[in-house]
Swiss-Prot record:
A motif (Cell attachment site) lies at residues 127-129. InterPro entries: CEA_cell_adhesion, Ig-like_dom, Ig-like_dom_sf, Ig-like_fold, Ig_sub, Ig_sub2, Ig_V-set. The keyword Signal applies. This is Pregnancy-specific beta-1-glycoprotein 5. It comes from Homo sapiens (Human). SUPFAM superfamilies: Immunoglobulin.
């Protein structure tokens, strides 16, 4: 396509007075080899942007052309016209101040609004044919820019395998199809969903610590889609069965005993140590310097998660040998 011609500026005569998609227009009854066509540039333009109705294959020997809003060629729908002789622009009642017509018949609409959607009529008048002319129609199909969806959730801190979760994708519209994503993978639509809008609510009967997300929802219409910001769950779980380290259970008197306990838990669990059922101390680590035989017995690490209300424990038996020389039989002199 060639460059646009500059809009005429020698004389102006004024009477009293989203996203858009465009289809190509073929003019009717035009007795030339190359048909006049119109295309929108860009084919999709966001509300508030500019769109150019670019005319191709404009015939020679023209007297002028007129643009109308809609398919009725009357004064009320008259936007603007261009008279070749004198390079005159004439503006009608439908002119908003945002339209610019060029000498090649192309029409620029600036700061596009929803009201700009619909049909446009271009009437081309050839010299010697001022009354009949050639008329064609060009239609904008309104394409609204999708809003950015967002997720609401009934519980952002669910308990593992216990709480039912309900994700809702907003906003609600019968015109949207809703799609859910987990860790970048689309989730299958439940067979119970009969209408696309019903999929805007995602129900999870239970959730595990491996299903924290991120979760995203996407809304789609016939022209495109828009995805929400990711949402990550804080799944409460545990405590799992704890482990005690090191695992060996035999000590000599006078050695130092160091034990640590760990259990998977969110939030972190509280730790308690008991020896033979008697509370010893709290915390993950237990240390007893210079252990003696009185420290023999059953060592238990108990863990508790106040958020989940769960508890768990692990026990081990510790043996302590007597000091060297204690508890041994005296040596006998050989006969």
């Amino acid at each position: 396509m060639g460059p646009l011609s500059a809009p005429p500026c020698t004389q102006h005569i004024t009477w009293k007075g989203l996203l858009l998609t465009a289809s190509l227009l073929n003019f009717w009854n035009l007795p030339i080899t190359a048909q006049v066509t119109i295309e929108a540039l860009p084919p999709k333009v966001s509300e508030g942007k500019d769109v150019l109705l670019l005319v191709h294959n404009l015939p020679q020997n023209l007297a002028g052309y007129i643009w109308y809003k809609g398919q009725l060629m009357d004064l009320y729908h008259y936007i603007t016209s261009y008279v070749v002789d004198g390079q005159i622009n004439i503006y009608g009642p439908a002119y908003t101040g945002r339209e610019t017509v060029y000498s090649n018949a192309s029409l620029l609409i600036q700061n596009v609004t929803r009201e700009d959607a619909g049909s446009y009529t271009l009437h081309i008048i050839k010299r010697g044919d001022r009354t009949r002319g050639v008329t064609g129609y060009f239609t904008f199909n309104l394409y609204l820019k999708l809003p950015k969806p967002y997720i609401t959730i009934n519980n952002s801190k669910p308990r593992e395998n216990k709480d039912v979760l309900a994700f809702t994708c907003e906003p609600k519209s019968e015109n949207y199809t809703y799609i859910w994503w987990l860790n970048g993978q689309s989730l299958p639509v439940s067979p119970r969903v009969k209408r696309p809008i019903e999929n805007r609510i995602l129900i999870l009967p239970s959730v595990t610590r491996n299903e924290t997300g991120p979760y995203e929802c996407e809304i789609r219409d016939r022209d495109g889609g828009m995805r929400s910001d990711p949402v990550t769950l804080n799944v409460l779980y545990g405590p799992d069965l704890p482990s005690i380290y090191p695992s060996f259970t035999y000590y000599r008197s006078g050695e130092n005993l160091y034990l640590s306990c760990f259990a998977e838990s969110n939030p972190p669990a509280e730790y308690f140590w008991t020896i033979n059922g008697k509370f010893q101390q709290s915390g993950q680590k237990l240390s007893i310097p210079q252990i003696t035989t009185k420290h023999r017995g059953l060592y238990t690490c108990s863990v508790r998660n106040s958020a989940t209300g769960k508890e768990s424990s692990k026990s081990m038996t510790v043996e302590v040998s007597a000091p060297s020389g204690i508890g041994r039989l005296p040596l006998l002199n050989p006969i």
